[in-house]
Amino acid sequence: MVNFTVDQIRAIMDKKANIRNMSVIAHVDHGKSTLTDSLVCKAGIIASARAGETRFTDTRKDEQERCITIKSTAISLFYELSENDLNFIKQSKDGSGFLINLIDSPGHVDFSSEVTAALRVTDGALVVVDCVSGVCVQTETVLRQAIAERIKPVLMMNKMDRALLELQLEPEELYQTFQRIVENVNVIISTYGEGESGPMGNIMIDPVLGTVGFGSGLHGWAFTLKQFAEMYVAKFAAKGEGQLGAAERAKKVEDMMKKLWGDRYFDPANGKFSKSANSPDGKKLPRTFCQLILDPIFKVFDAIMNFRKEETAKLIEKLDIKLDSEDKDKEGKPLLKAVMRRWLPAGDALLQMITIHLPSPVTAQKYRCELLYEGPPDDEAAMGIKSCDPKGPLMMYISKMVPTSDKGRFYAFGRVFSGVVSTGLKVRIMGPNYTPGKKEDLYLKPIQRTILMMGRYVEPIEDVPCGNIVGLVGVDQFLVKTGTITTFEHAHNMRVMKFSVSPVVRVAVEAKNPADLPKLVEGLKRLAKSDPMVQCIIEESGEHIIAGAGELHLEICLKDLEEDHACIPIKKSDPVVSYRETVSEESNVLCLSKSPNKHNRLYMKARPFPDGLAEDIDKGEVSARQELKARARYLAEKYEWDVAEARKIWCFGPDGTGPNILTDITKGVQYLNEIKDSVVAGFQWATKEGALCEENMRGVRFDVHDVTLHADAIHRGGGQIIPTARRCLYASVLTAQPRLMEPIYLVEIQCPEQVVGGIYGVLNRKRGHVFEESQVAGTPMFVVKAYLPVNESFGFTADLRSNTGGQAFPQCVFDHWQILPGDPFDNSSRPSQVVAETRKRKGLKEGIPALDNFLDKL
């Protein structure tokens, strides 16, 4: 299938049971893009000779130069299963041709927002793990996200060539390595998954079922137990039995797969399988996986890499491998590649695993609907999503914007969950802040064109039915990053994506030539569109701030801004870190503030959260949308709150969802409800810009103790109450031992044993501390996990490499907020320097404002 016409693809799109939407996820440099190549070349978009070198999905120039994937790209593949293989599919199917929409996502932590966007539009994930270094921190983060989105994983052990050629492992050691990785992945799945009783059933991976692949993306070969089981079934069948029917054959292969993994042993003397490790006459038996699967592979490697021509020729003949004439003259590694590629082609093994084990939209949307759709579970839109119904109302989620070749326009990239999207269709474009029945963030516009994404190319297409991934033209002006597109009037939004990282590093940018300012502003708008994570902020002082997840992320954003979006030379400041303000004990006095007209008084106190509550709010375990009683019960049980107080939470802040709480513990106050909105507004304002240096507050609980109000409504309007509430909140913070919190990275460093000492040295200089150190079993590598303040992380990588001779590779993920030790009022302390710097940068008055500005006397 080299030449694909759009009409052919369009025909398959209607067979929604035969669509697979999947993403490839993994730790950085475990070989996702390389593997994706062998899939793409099998489905015929790259000429097969170049696979493994092209990295088709790395479409950007900087991706090809840095050899990392930065943005997630989508490609449609087509694969036909043979009659025999169709019997392995346990869900509904429709013909033998399958359309696979594949999204290759980046593995670098700084880009994990890209991964989140990719996960939202897919139903299954191919998790790639390097079998030498095992399951790493990013694999875990991404897999956890996938399971939270109810996405079914299958596993691929990549880089087997390294295990055989570099580490020279014995078959039994290699089996143990695989076994350990499978266990690690299953531990993650069972920790974050919903168990067998959940809506998805059992999603644990198991080589016996064929949900684990083994192979090498670089050399272009791979297999699951199914491939070998088929060879042996055919071999045993040839000895005596005649032809089997397809269904019986599938049954036999499944039985055979059960014997090829785990504690099953093979007795070569009589060709029997046994469950004990010793044969009747006391000999030690080889494990079946080693004897029947690894042994032939080892033999091929051994014969070819030691240049034994006759043995090689015999093996090639025995395995029935047909080489091209040009391959016959090769020797060493090139010949090894050619032989393995012919014998166990990676494309086939992986595409079979994907089509057989990953769910179709029909299967997946049944259990994903409740996570995807915010509205009631029984309205038209929800029913359409659940049944993946092309006749239902159009429901489509845009997960990100993809820049087009002409500067400044974007394709909206997303997935149709119900209905059909077509060129010229008039739709409702709903941004993330849309609420049903209101007009904000809602546009009624026609779609100009629908297009298919093909890696580096796009193809126009008339219409696309549900279950497919598509690009839209002409929607980009109405959405910033994500949104919902629908034709159903009462539709609610599709749920917003939760990112596992937060933008904590910021730089200020300005144009080198002041006349270019309008271009810079325009460029920042485009940048905010093109990256799901980045935040572009204009400070009151007129500074333009870009906030990103880490150093690398920001570097790439700035490069994009300079070259693609604004196209002007740019000056940037040194990166600075966002802080949070908090309190460390309860206010020592009951704070009183009077309104400007002296007729209203508010009394409040502040106190810190119990440990863990702020994190629960971030995760969404406790939120403003929850049912009141359930939330009160949760707070009472887990954090020992008073139930009566827990029920009287007025709001969360900043932005209505942040990790600060305003509770009302007043007794019988007149007119209280009339000023509730004003106090809440003051609270949102105060928590967004704290008292110390106008950073967000975090982990503070404010209690309204008492309120005395003027009887006349006109004297207690918003203009009187809002600033008073804010002053009172500031006073209660300043009397409660305020502190600063700084963001902390979790750093995972892989390195050989001899340089571990160097790592400790670097971390100690940077205020970091190691909390776990372990050896990767079966390899000389150590994994060191440490906490490192984000503030100290600039240039950390370079420092580490120079101190360890380039042998240590760090991965940083934002992990938590931690209180900066020291009192911000003490001039010699670290926090007071930070406060002073931040205030200076923001153009505020020097020094923390005095308490008298906020606290009034009776």
Swiss-Prot record:
The modification N6-succinyllysine is found at residues 152, 272, 572. There is a cross-link at residue 239 (Glycyl lysine isopeptide (Lys-Gly) (interchain with G-Cter in SUMO1)). GTP binds at residues 26-33, 158-161, 216-218. Residues 17-362 form the tr-type G domain. Diphthamide is 2-[3-carboxyamido-3-(trimethyl-ammonio)propyl]histidine. CDD domains: aeEF2_snRNP_like_IV (cd01681), eEF2_snRNP_like_C (cd04096), EF2 (cd01885), EF2_snRNP_III (cd16261), EF2_snRNP_like_II (cd03700). The modification Phosphotyrosine is found at residues 265, 373. It catalyses: GTP + H2O = GDP + phosphate + H(+). It is found in: Cytoplasm; Nucleus. Its EC number is 3.6.5.-. PROSITE patterns: G_TR_1, G_TR_2. One of its GO terms (biological process) is translational elongation. Its main location: cytoplasm. One of its GO terms (cellular component) is cytosol. InterPro entries: EFG_II, EFG_III/V, EFG_V-like, EFTu-like_2, G_TR_CS, P-loop_NTPase, Ribosomal_Su5_D2-typ_SF, Ribsml_uS5_D2-typ_fold_subgr. GO terms for molecular function: 5S rRNA binding; actin filament binding; GTP binding; GTPase activity; lncRNA binding; p53 binding; protein kinase binding; ribosome binding. Keywords: Acetylation, Cytoplasm, Elongation factor, GTP-binding, Hydrolase, Isopeptide bond, Methylation, Nucleotide-binding, Nucleus, Phosphoprotein, Protein biosynthesis, Ubl conjugation. The modification N6-acetyllysine is found at residues 235, 239, 272, 275, 439, 445, 619. Catalyzes the GTP-dependent ribosomal translocation step during translation elongation. During this step, the ribosome changes from the pre-translocational (PRE) to the post-translocational (POST) state as the newly formed A-site-bound peptidyl-tRNA and P-site-bound deacylated tRNA move to the P and E sites, respectively. Catalyzes the coordinated movement of the two tRNA molecules, the mRNA and conformational changes in the ribosome. Belongs to the TRAFAC class translation factor GTPase superfamily. Classic translation factor GTPase family. EF-G/EF-2 subfamily. Binds to 80S ribosomes. Actively translating ribosomes show mutually exclusive binding of eIF5a (EIF5A or EIF5A2) and EEF2/eEF2. Interacts with SERBP1; interaction sequesters EEF2/eEF2 at the A-site of the ribosome, thereby blocking the interaction sites of the mRNA-tRNA complex, promoting ribosome stabilization and hibernation. Interacts with HABP4; interaction takes place at the A-site of hibernating ribosomes and promotes ribosome stabilization. Component of the mRNA surveillance SURF complex, at least composed of ERF1, ERF3 (ERF3A or ERF3B), EEF2, UPF1/RENT1, SMG1, SMG8 and SMG9. This is Elongation factor 2. The gene is Eef2.
